[in-house]
């Protein structure tokens, strides 16, 4: 197995760990979490997208914990934070938020061709974040790592990121354009962040040329949806945690959660109906890795910048 190239930042070294063998070495982005954290300082309104439904009625445990932890950190920094996903993926997300004592400010992503424009016009986020959310591949389908379509269960939330990307390329972002639905007018494109671990998630369009060099399956399933800042990690939740650790460095505040909270997050997601995205079993694991493994990673992230040494472990 190849080893990802990382710099001297211990947070990058932790995010580059790949114990589940996802094969991220070829497209890992050193400094990605730090760049995303810097982009999030001063965020006003944040919309977080998560939830990967691997089969009918089976949302996975990777995604909601990362969304809850990152959302809490941003809310503590003064941002307004909301979350959206498919209706079937909302219970694990709500469970994760409750496990941290956070407001469950979530809504089901609507149906319809103009849904993306309508949501962006209504929410007007300054920052749009995707954590472990499928992004369309070159054929327009949504594929899992085995090359099987999951489009039936996952609505096209990535359209918001594509729409934001197109809007940001315009010279005058707020200017109306003929032929666009009324709901698309009058909003400014948010800065976009994507977090993933497999190549088929929102944001991986930013490294599509690298993914094309991987196996034929990876090249086929790779997402074409780009973002302004991409964070790659061995587990997508870890990518979100890495951003929070970097935010802690920037602010000097204890924003990262604790290992004990990590255990509660995974348990809450499982009890709300989430399954391991790889085994599809309803058990307290994420990408085949035990809850204790994830808690250990959180402990190391905290130690990587002295967080736990400053405040001690909380239960």
Where are these regions (language model features)?
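Positively charged, low-complexity intrinsically disordered leader regions
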Residues: 1-45
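Histidine-anchored nucleotide/phosphate-binding helix
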Residues: 60-78
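C-terminal functional extensions of proteins
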Residues: 199-315
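Hydrophobic/aromatic beta-strand patches that form the interior of the parallel beta-sheet core
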Residues: 82, 107, 127, 191-195
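A short helix->loop->beta-strand "cap" motif at the edges of active sites that frequently abuts
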Residues: 78-79, 165-171, 185-193
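An acidic, phosphate/nucleotide-engaging active-site surface
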Residues: 95-168
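Short internal beta-strands
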Residues: 79-88
